[in-house]
From Swiss-Prot:
Positions bearing Phosphoserine: 17, 366
GO cellular component: axon; cytoplasm; mitochondrion; neuron projection; neuronal cell body; synapse
Reactions that this protein is recorded to catalyse: choline + acetyl-CoA = acetylcholine + CoA
An annotated Gene Ontology molecular function: choline O-acetyltransferase activity
Active site residues per record: 335
InterPro entries, per database record: Carn_acyl_trans, CAT-like_dom_sf, Cho/carn_acyl_trans, Cho/carn_acyl_trans_2
Keyword Transferase in annotation: yes
Gene Ontology BP terms: adult walking behavior; chemical synaptic transmission; dendrite development; establishment of synaptic specificity at neuromuscular junction; muscle organ development; neuromuscular synaptic transmission; neuron differentiation; rhythmic behavior
Name of the molecule in the record: Choline O-acetyltransferase
Organism listed in the record: Mus musculus (Mouse)
EC numbers, comma separated: 2.3.1.6
Annotated spans, Disordered: 615-641
Function in brief: Catalyzes the reversible synthesis of acetylcholine (ACh) from acetyl CoA and choline at cholinergic synapses.
One matching Pfam family: Carn_acyltransf
Name of the gene encoding the protein in the UniProt record: Chat
Length: 641
C-alpha cells in the first residue's frame, strides 16, 4: 500500500485560502434601474402587449424614487457589505434546497464516460479500483490545497476563478428536509476526515475502508476488497431491502421516511456511514442491453428504475461513480454543492489518472489479511416497507416519463463557427432559439448558465438567450412570404449573436438580472407583510419558468453531460461543441403532448445546417455547401447516438 503522510484535519478557513491568495472581488450589486430596464427588455417580446403594459406600470411603481425597490436595494447593499456573496444563500435555497422534486432527472445531472469493454467482472472491478485510486489522489491534492487555480476561458478570459466549489466535491451531503433540504459539509476539526467509500452492489451498501493504519490501499488491495463485496452481495440469503430507493423519492417524502429510519440505532449507524463517506461507487448490473449513448445516459440519469439499477444509488451524496458490468460508466452528481464545470474538471483528472497510472506513490507490501468490507444493515418497519413501495412506483414513473436523446450533429463544429468570427456558444444558442421557434412559432424564457466564479463564492447567473435580436432573426428565417434577402438574414444573425455575447459578458461580470431580482424578492419576504406586486405579476412568474434550460459543458476527453427539463412542458438542452461536431443531449417529458425530444433535436440539426448555409453564402470558401441529404436529415437519419 502507498504510505500516506498523516495530515491533521483541515480547519474550514483553510479551504478558503485560495480566495485569500487570489484576493477575488465581491460580487457587485447592479444598479436598480438598469436591472428593471433589462428585465422589461427581456420580456417585452415574449408576452402579449396588454400584459406587458400592465407589467411596465408595476415595474415603474416598484422602481419609483423613494419606493419599495429603492428600499430593498439599500438593504441589498448593506447585505453586500456584511457577506462574502450577497446572493449565494438565496440562490442555493431557490435553485436546489427548497425544491421538493425527486433528484433523479429533475435535479441531478450525469456525466457519461466512453463505453468500456469489460470482458468479465474482474475487468469491471479493476476499472472501479483504478477509479477509486484516482479519487484518493485527487482528494489528497484538495486536502493539501495543491489543486491549481482555474482561469477564465472564452469571454473576458485570463481572470482567476473562485475554487471553493472543489472543496465540496468529497465533503458534501444533501440532507432531506420536510420543507427545505440542508447542504451539510464535513468541516469539523474534531471528527476525523472520512476514510471510507460506500460501494453499492445489488442494491446493497458496503463500507470500503480506503485507509488502514494510516496507509492508503493500493489498486490491488482495492480490487481484492471489491471482489469480496461482489461475493457478499451475491449471497441472496443476506440481502436486505433496497433502501437506496428512498433517496430517489420527492425530498419531503424521503425526509419523512428518513425520520422513521432514524428511530432504530442500526439504521442510524448505517446512515451515518453513508453521510460521511468520501463518495459512492455503484457496481451496476447490466442495463437494457442497448449500449448507445442515449441508453447509457439513461442508466446514469435514473438507473432504469427499480428493476434494473435505479435502487443501486444514494442520490443525496454529491458524487456517485457508476461502473456497470456492461461497460456503462460515469458519474451522477448531486448538483447543489458545485457546478458542472467543476465536476468535469474533477472527472477528467480521474480519467487521466486511470489512463496514465500514478507511478509516484511508494508501494509497500499489502497487509497479510485486509479486514473484510462491512455490509450496512437496515431494520425495516412496516412503515418503511410502505415508503419503499411508494418510492419504487414513483421512480418507475420518472423512468417512463423521460423523453431523452443524445444527438451528435456532425456536419460541422466550432472550427467552422470560429471561421465566421462568431462565438461558438452564441451561435449554438441562436440555433436553439431558431429550432424552438420553428416548432412552436414563439420564443420562451430561456436559461443558460453563466459562471460568476470571478467573484468570491460565485456560482452562476442566467444568460437570457431569447433576446429581441434572436426573435428578429428567427422570424426572418421562417417567414417565407417576406422574401428576406440572405444578406439581411446574415446581418440579423450577426446581431443576434452579438446580443447573446453582450448579455454573456453582462452575466459573467455580475450585471445580469436574475440573481439581483431573486435577492430583492427574498429581502422583501422579511420586510413586507404581503409579497410585492412586482414578484406576483404574471410576467415575472413567467420569466422564471424556463421552458428552455440550456448549458454548454465542454470536455477535452470522450464524455458528455446531460440532465432533465426544469418544467413539465420544457426541454433540457446540454451541448458539448467539438472541433468538427456538436453533441446535444435533449430531454423533455412524455407527459407533455406538446414536446418531443426527437423533433426538437431534428429542428436543432436543421437550424444549424441552415445557419451554415447562410454563412457559406457569404464565404463559400470556408465550408463546402451542404448536400440535400445533409439539409434534410435529422437525428433519426443522422447520428442518433
Amino acid at each position: 500500500m502507498p504510505i500516506l503522510e498523516k495530515v491533521p484535519p483541515k480547519m474550514p478557513v483553510q479551504a478558503s485560502s485560495c480566495e485569500e491568495v487570489l484576493d477575488l472581488p465581491k460580487l457587485p450589486v447592479p444598479p436598480l434601474q438598469q436591472t428593471l430596464a433589462t428585465y422589461l427588455q427581456c420580456m417585452q417580446h415574449l408576452v402579449p402587449e396588454e400584459q406587458f403594459r400592465k407589467s411596465q406600470a408595476i415595474v415603474k411603481r416598484f422602481g419609483a424614487p423613494g419606493g419599495l425597490g429603492e428600499t430593498l436595494q439599500e438593504k441589498l447593499l448593506e447585505r453586500q457589505e456584511k457577506t462574502a456573496n450577497w446572493v449565494s444563500e438565496y440562490w442555493l435555497n431557490d435553485m436546489y434546497l427548497n425544491n421538493r422534486l425527486a433528484l433523479p432527472v429533475n435535479s441531478s445531472p450525469a456525466v457519461i464516460f466512453a463505453r468500456q469493454h469489460f470482458q468479465d467482472t474482474n475487468d469491471q472491478l479493476r476499472f472501479a479500483a483504478s477509479l477509486i485510486s484516482g479519487v484518493l489522489s485527487y482528494k489528497a491534492l484538495l486536502d493539501s490545497q495543491s489543486i491549481p487555480t482555474d482561469w477564465a476561458k472564452g469571454q473576458l478570459s485570463g481572470q482567476p476563478l473562485c475554487m471553493k466549489q472543489y472543496y465540496r466535491l468529497f465533503s458534501s451531503y444533501r440532507l432531506p428536509g420536510h420543507t427545505q433540504d440542508t447542504l451539510v459539509a464535513q468541516k469539523s476539526s474534531i471528527m476525523p476526515e472520512p476514510e471510507h467509500v460506500i460501494v453499492a452492489c445489488c442494491n446493497q451498501f458496503f463500507v470500503l475502508d480506503v485507509v488502514i493504519n494510516f496507509r492508503r490501499l493500493s489498486e490491488g488491495d482495492l480490487f481484492t476488497q471489491l471482489r469480496k463485496i461482489v461475493k457478499m452481495a451475491s449471497n441472496e440469503d443476506e440481502r436486505l431491502p433496497p433502501i437506496g430507493l428512498l433517496t430517489s423519492d420527492g425530498r419531503s417524502e424521503w425526509a419523512k421516511a428518513r425520520t422513521v429510519l432514524l428511530k432504530d440505532s442500526t439504521n442510524r449507524d448505517s446512515l451515518d456511514m453513508i453521510e460521511r463517506c468520501i463518495c459512492l461507487v455503484c457496481l451496476d448490473g447490466p442495463g437494457t442491453g442497448d449500449l448507445s449513448d442515449t441508453h447509457r445516459a439513461l442508466q446514469l440519469l435514473h438507473g432504469g428504475g427499480c428493476s434494473l439499477n435505479g435502487a443501486n444509488r444514494w442520490y443525496d451524496k454529491s458524487l456517485q461513480f457508476v461502473v456497470g458490468r456492461d461497460g456503462t460508466c460515469g458519474v451522477v452528481c448531486e448538483h447543489s454543492p458545485f457546478d458542472g464545470i467543476v465536476l468535469v474538471q474533477c472527472t477528467e483528472h480521474l480519467l487521466k489518472h486511470m489512463m496514465t497510472g500514478n507511478k509516484k506513490l511508494v508501494r509497500v507490501d499489502s497487509v497479510s489479511e485486509l479486514p473484510a468490507p462491512r455490509r450496512l444493515r437496515w431494520k425495516c418497519s412496516p412503515e418503511t416497507q410502505g415508503h419503499l413501495a411508494s418510492s419504487a412506483e414513483k421512480l418507475q414513473r420518472i423512468v417512463k416519463n423521460l423523453d431523452f436523446i443524445v444527438y451528435k450533429f456532425d456536419n460541422y463544429g466550432k472550427t467552422f463557427i470560429k471561421k465566421q468570427k462568431c462565438s461558438p456558444d452564441g451561435f449554438i444558442q441562436v440555433a436553439l432559439q431558431l429550432a424552438y421557434y420553428r416548432l412552436y412559432q414563439r420564443l420562451v424564457p430561456t436559461y443558460e448558465s453563466a459562471s460568476i466564479r470571478r467573484f468570491q463564492e460565485g456560482r452562476v447567473d442566467n444568460i437570457r438567450s431569447a433576446t429581441p435580436e434572436a426573435l428578429a432573426f428567427v422570424q426572418a428565417m421562417t417567414d417565407h412570404k417576406a422574401a428576406v434577402l440572405a444578406s439581411e438574414k446574415l446581418q440579423l444573425l450577426q446581431r443576434a449573436i452579438q446580443a447573446q455575447t453582450e448579455y454573456t459578458v453582462m452575466a459573467i461580470t455580475g450585471m445580469a438580472i436574475d440573481n439581483h431580482l431573486l435577492a430583492l424578492r427574498e429581502l422583501a419576504r422579511d420586510l413586507c407583510k404581503e409579497p410585492p406586486e412586482m414578484f406576483m405579476d404574471e410576467t415575472y412568474l413567467m420569466s422564471n419558468r424556463f421552458i428552455l434550460s440550456t448549458s454548454q459543458v465542454p470536455t477535452t476527453m470522450e464524455m458528455f453531460c446531460c440532465y432533465g427539463p426544469v418544467v413539465p412542458n420544457g426541454y433540457g438542452a446540454c451541448y458539448n461543441p467539438h472541433a468538427e461536431a456538436i453533441t446535444f443531449c435533449i430531454s423533455s417529458f412524455h407527459g407533455c403532448k406538446e414536446t418531443s425530444s426527437v423533433e426538437f433535436a431534428e429542428a436543432v440539426g436543421a437550424s444549424l445546417v441552415d445557419m451554415r448555409d447562410l454563412c457559406s453564402s457569404r464565404q463559400p470558401a470556408d465550408s463546402k455547401p451542404p448536400t440535400a441529404k445533409e439539409r434534410a436529415r435529422g437525428p433519426s437519419q443522422a447520428k442518433q447516438s
